[in-house]
């Protein structure tokens, strides 16, 4: 017994030293397992995600830079080059000369099917502007203002067309003079689109009146000035019309995209869209005809909706675990040109709604409602080869990168994952928001200051509107949830986190801190709320301006 006394004394001596670390460790394990994380950690990340459409051009550029570096670190970009422009077909010079002399260039180039996606959007903008000019000329002729206008002779018009042909760039779609900055005679200047009642409509109108950024190109690698306004959605008219019709009339159609359709009716609809007519898809149309028209649009596109230089990168995600695949798909979507990502989002949204009605259900009246039998796997089998096409860059890349599975099987797996998670692909998670904020701060602190002030005013306007609605009508039942939704859609990045970039004292701070959550601080009175900073030349050679 006497030999055990030294051990007992040693245990009694070490107990006071060991117990505090053990208690701390047990408390930490309790927080992780029961509360969902350490103090200050929010386990529900989806409530803090924001849409990429709420980001400005500058933030979208920094988002693409962040996605590029993340994918390079994961070895997902073998042949991708950020400064490489998307391929554009070279026009036939002799044929173009002949059409210009006859004045038929505009009539034959404004198509919808069988061309690249950016060309479809440019043709729609050109047609819309041409209709506006035609209507204005008709008004002038009806009022007699154009009766005395002198017309140039045939020789002058011929030399004018030849001069415009040689002076225009051949690698870009030709636009009317009214579309260029030189042709605009008026301008609109606003401090913030959030102060307007219909800011989205005004933003779309302003971006239709002038091409601020070449359609079909990435922001990454550009040396132009970046705007601090969001980018208007760029979706072809045929895609929007077909998706809206299917969501309204085709969710319960059994075997949509797979059953037989009328080839004659699809050809008529295709010709109407190619001619630039105002096509209205009403109740008289067949759902399967409209579905076939939408499928033909993506199948006959010269380029791929998922860019050619990212072909193998998308296929490589099929070899990952589901959570890792979703994260990689998010980064790849960020790298896509705005027109491609917007069109992809619209298509995936419609396809996801179809999958929600694939099984039988009980209606409101208690009757059995049959499902459409189109799961995400079935839709991926239909659209897999139409969305992921192997082009020139993809063929060169596939020689160096070999997959363990067939390319068609991988494409089906990728499209299925995108349909199932369409609402997450176009959201920016908090950790990416922090990196975007840091990159904006490094390039232009004044731009970060302006973006935060504008979003602060947006939140204040939303709060005032909610208070007015509460006074005019009954109180909102879920006011806290509604206010949280407003905050989630208004923040350009995760401002509530503790890892914010270092901002000087003169800049605005977060509106959603612990002491004043829901009560934005009042800006200081000794300086204007929205100041216009001077142009700043960043290290990358990119300037920034405030619209």
Curated annotation (Swiss-Prot):
The keyword Lyase does not apply. SUPFAM superfamilies: GTPase activation domain, GAP (SSF48350). The record marks 258 as: Arginine finger. Residues 1-40 form the signal peptide. GO terms for biological process: signal transduction. It comes from the Eukaryota. Residues 524-538 have a biased composition (Basic and acidic residues). Residues 493-547 are annotated as: Disordered. GO terms for molecular function: GTPase activator activity. Coiled coil: none annotated. Residues 226-426 form the Rho-GAP domain. It holds the Pfam family RhoGAP. Keywords: GTPase activation, Signal. GTPase activator for the Rho-type GTPases by converting them to an inactive GDP-bound state. This is Rho GTPase-activating protein 36.
């Amino acid at each position: 017994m006497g030999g055990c006394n030294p051990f007992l004394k040693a245990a009694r001596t070490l107990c006071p030293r060991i117990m505090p670390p053990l208690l701390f460790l047990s408390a930490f394990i309790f927080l992780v397992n029961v509360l969902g994380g350490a103090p200050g950690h929010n386990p529900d990340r989806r409530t803090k995600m924001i849409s990429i459409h709420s980001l400005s051009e500058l933030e979208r550029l920094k988002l693409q830079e962040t996605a590029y570096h993340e994918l390079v670190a994961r070895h997902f970009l073998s042949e991708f080059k950020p400064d490489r422009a998307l391929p554009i077909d070279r026009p036939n010079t002799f044929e173009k000369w002949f059409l210009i002399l006859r004045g038929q260039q505009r009539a034959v180039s404004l198509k919808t099917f069988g061309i690249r996606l950016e060309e479809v959007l440019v043709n729609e903008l050109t047609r819309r502007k041409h209709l506006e000019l035609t209507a204005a000329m008709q008004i002038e002729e009806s009022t007699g203002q154009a009766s005395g206008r002198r017309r140039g002779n045939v020789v002058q018009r011929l030399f004018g067309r030849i001069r415009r042909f040689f002076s225009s760039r051949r690698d870009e779609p030709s636009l009317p003079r009214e579309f260029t900055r030189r042709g605009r005679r008026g301008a609109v200047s606003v401090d913030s689109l959030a102060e307007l009642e219909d800011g989205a409509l005004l933003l779309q109108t302003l971006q239709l009146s002038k091409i601020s950024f070449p359609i079909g190109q990435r922001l990454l690698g550009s040396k132009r000035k970046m705007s601090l306004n969001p980018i208007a959605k760029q979706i072809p008219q045929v895609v929007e019309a077909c998706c809206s019709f299917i969501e309204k009339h085709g969710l319960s159609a059994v075997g949509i995209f797979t059953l037989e359709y009328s080839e004659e009716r699809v050809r008529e609809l295709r010709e109407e869209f190619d001619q630039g007519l105002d096509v209205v898809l009403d109740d008289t149309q067949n759902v399967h005809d409209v579905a076939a028209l939408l499928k033909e649009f993506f199948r006959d596109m010269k380029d791929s909706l998922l860019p050619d230089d990212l072909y193998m990168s998308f296929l490589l995600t099929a070899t990952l675990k589901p959570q890792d695949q979703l994260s990689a798909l998010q980064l790849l979507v960020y790298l896509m040109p705005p027109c491609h990502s917007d069109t992809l989002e619209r298509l995936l949204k419609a396809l996801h709604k179809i999958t929600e009605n694939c099984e039988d259900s009980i209606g409101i009246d208690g009757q059995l409602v049959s499902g459409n039998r189109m799961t995400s796997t079935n839709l991926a089998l239909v659209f897999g080869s139409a969305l992921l096409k192997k082009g020139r860059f993809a063929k060169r890349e596939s020689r160096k990168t070999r997959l363990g599975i067939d390319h068609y099987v991988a494409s089906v797996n990728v499209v299925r994952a995108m349909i199932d998670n369409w609402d997450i692909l176009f959201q920016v998670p908090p950790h990416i928001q922090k990196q975007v904020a840091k990159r904006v701060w490094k390039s232009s602190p004044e731009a970060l200051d302006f973006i935060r002030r504008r979003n602060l005013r947006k939140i204040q306007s939303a709060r005032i509107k909610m208070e007015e609605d509460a006074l005019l009508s009954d109180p909102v039942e879920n006011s806290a949830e509604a206010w949280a939704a407003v905050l989630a859609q208004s923040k350009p990045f995760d401002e509530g986190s503790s890892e914010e970039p270092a901002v000087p004292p003169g800049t605005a701070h977060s509106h959603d801190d612990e002491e004043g959550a829901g009560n934005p601080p009042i800006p200081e009175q000794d300086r204007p709320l929205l100041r216009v900073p001077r142009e700043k030349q960043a290290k990358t050679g990119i300037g920034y301006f405030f619209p």
